[in-house]
Structures are given as C-alpha cells and as structure tokens.
Amino acid sequence: MAIATPESYADMLDRAKAGKYAIPAINVTSSQTLSAALKGFADAESDGIVQISNGGAAYWSGSSRLDRVAGSLAFAAYARAVGDLYPGIVGLHTDHCPKKFLDCWIHPLLEIEAERVKRGE
C-alpha cells in the first residue's frame, strides 16, 4: 500500500463519499499490528487508515524511552518501508490526543512535517 499523499488521501475520501462507504481505520501498536492491518486491507482489497495512539507512539520508541515523537516517526518510517509491498493506499494518523500531550507530541510532529514539506520530502 502506498502511503497516502495529500492528493491520494483526498481522492481516497472522495471515492468513499461517492460510493457511500467508510474507510476502515485500525489502531496499531507495533510492527506486528501494523503489518496485520496492511495485510487485512490487502486481503479485503481496501484502502485504509492506520492510527497510532499516544501510548502506541511511546511504545514504538522502545520501552526504556517512551518518546512519543520518536515513536511516531518510527511508526511512519516502518509504514513507508513496508507499505509498498501491499496494494492500495493507506493513510497515517495519530489517534485522539489528550490536551496534555499536544505540546510534547502533536506540535513537534507538525513542525517536523512542515520542515519536510519545505524540503520537498
């Protein structure tokens, strides 16, 4: 599954709206659950969304670090590395974010992504 670009993500949502169906979204907590979600989407011949919670993001960084930003980046890197092995499009999301994690998790991720966009990545 190719990781969705802004354009392919919008197209995925437009197709779902026109077809009157929902895009499946699965919370993932590890490389195993991410791989299982990708396989499930492929088996169902469906695009999909994978989401990482604040706890899942912390787990991805390693149990001795619990760094949500590093874990989120690791999740995304792994998804990009294996995503092309599967057909379809997959969107990457963070799951619900408690307000107490906005400044230490979501805002840094947004800053990192803004810098990547500036560099054309």
Identify what each model region corresponds to:
Residues 32-52:
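Catalytic domains of carbohydrate-active enzymes, especially glycoside hydrolases
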Residues 4-8, 28-32, 70-74:
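Conserved active-site and cofactor/substrate-binding residues in soluble primary-metabolism enzymes
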Residues 1-24:
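N-terminal amphipathic alpha-helix/helix-capping segment at the start of soluble metabolic enzymes
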Residues 14-18, 39-46, 80-84:
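Generic secondary-structure signature for well-ordered alpha-helical cores
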Residues 54-121:
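Active-site beta->alpha loop and helix N-cap motifs at the rims of alpha/beta catalytic domains
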Residues 16-20, 51, 58-59:
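Gly-rich Lys/Arg/Thr-decorated short loops/hinges at beta-loop-alpha junctions or inter-strand turns
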Residues 27, 37, 95:
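Conserved, mostly hydrophobic/aromatic
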Residues 21-25, 47-51, 85, 89-93:
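Structural preference for beta-strand elements that scaffold enzyme active sites
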